Regions:
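Conserved alpha-helical substructure of the radical SAM core
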Residues: 1-86, 90-92, 97, 101-102
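A general structural motif
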Residues: 6-8, 53-57, 85-87, 113-117, ...
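Short, flexible loop/turn elements at secondary-structure junctions
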Residues: 15, 64, 92-94, 124, ...
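Short cysteine clusters
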Residues: 17, 21-24, 216, 229, ...
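Short catalytic/ligand-binding loop motif for oxyanion handling, primarily in non-cytosolic enzymes
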Residues: 30-32, 67-68, 97-99, 126-130, ...
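Acidic, amphipathic alpha-helical patches
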Residues: 103-107
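Radical SAM enzyme [4Fe-4S]-AdoMet core and its adjacent flexible, acidic
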Residues: 108-247, 251-255
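Flexible mid-to-C-terminal extensions adjoining Fe-S/redox cofactors in radical SAM and related proteins
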Residues: 238-324
Length: 324
């Protein structure tokens, strides 16, 4: 099966985030210190564009990329000065948006540095840590500075009708999270596998046995690059396709196309989905739960076991993601 070129990539500038959201499939939080140096980000950005005949659209993400404003704007300005492809978007939870003046100043700077869209996170999980007035302020000023077509909110309905969730009693907040997760918007892996899975419809591992993962792993054309250079499928945090700190993106992509089927983790998932990886883990002593909230939940549980038992070397990481 040919591996499609990556035409969209998110550079994780940091694993740090002011929030520790129940929905975070990358397990980011205030205790994460991993950062991608500007020089590394520029090199990877350039290599991603060069490795694909169609180019590669870049978005900057985290963690929370606004955790270091100076580094964020330095990267954007350097990328523009270096003639790299357009910056598709920058993502943020708006924790920093404390005044119209500050928001306007930073958005004008990003606009001049070539940012396409501003992507704002707003949902019950983020509002446990970020007052909802901050994403509302950011969206409002963003539409004035950039135009409404360049401001994207995930999710707009919550931004308009939601509220702060840190003030809710834990049972009330958990019930709200459960109702929101039931809409199917979240990836049930990482922290979400522990925080949200119990409230979702459950299926036995045998009911998840007919789902190959070849499309999201090899054909989806979207990846994330972690601060340490680990390249992960766009929606599969903790599954490593290669390391662009060890070799160029082009060489890494070629290597994946040549040997993906021989890789113990990626190969098993591409052929038979989490059920195939479950067989490997069971032989090593893994005991599955009776039910899971979908194949991503099962996959995460299996991968976490394998990582903790020293299996999947080079394919499971970064390490901090599995230590949550």
């Amino acid at each position: 099966m040919p591996v499609k070129h990556w035409s969209r990539a998110g550079l994780m500038l940091t694993a740090w985030c002011n929030a520790r959201c129940a929905s975070c499939y990358l397990c980011c939080g205030p205790d994460r210190a991993d950062e991608m140096p500007v020089a590394t980000a520029l090199r990877v950005w350039e290599e991603l564009i060069a490795a694909s005949p169609h180019g590669c659209r870049i978005h900057l993400t985290g963690g929370e990329p606004f955790g270091s404003w100076e580094r964020l704007i330095e990267l954007c300005l350097a990328a523009r000065a270096g003639g790299l492809g357009p910056l598709e978007s920058v993502e943020t939870n708006a924790f920093w948006a404390s005044s119209p003046a500050l928001v306007g100043e930073r958005l004008r700077a990003l606009d001049q540095a070539g940012m396409g869209k501003l992507v704002i996170s707003a949902d019950p999980y983020h509002q446990q840590f970020v007052p909802i007035e901050r994403p509302r302020l950011l969206a409002r000023v963003g539409e004035d500075v950039l135009g409404a077509h360049r401001v994207q909110v995930r999710w707009r309905d919550w931004l308009e009708t939601g509220g702060d969730t840190d003030c809710l009693a834990p049972p009330e907040r958990e019930a709200l999270f459960a109702r929101y997760a039931a809409a199917g918007r979240e990836r049930v892996s990482g922290r979400a596998a522990f925080s949200l899975s119990a409230s979702l419809p459950q299926r036995s591992p045998s009911q998840l046995a007919d789902t190959s993962c070849s499309e999201p792993l090899l054909r989806a054309k979207h990846v994330h690059v972690a601060p340490d250079g680990s390249v992960m499928p766009g929606t599969c945090g903790g599954l490593v396709l290669g390391r662009c700190d060890h070799e160029s993106v082009a060489v890494m992509w070629q290597r994946l196309g040549q040997d993906w089927a021989d890789r113990p983790v990626v190969g098993a998932l591409a052929r038979g989905g989490p059920a195939a990886l479950l067989a490997t883990a069971t032989a090593a002593g893994f005991v599955p739960e009776k039910t899971y909230a979908g194949k991503c939940h099962l996959c995460w549980h299996v991968r976490r076991f394998l990582h903790r038992h020293g299996a999947g070397e080079g394919e499971l990481g970064p390490d901090w993601l599995y230590q949550a």
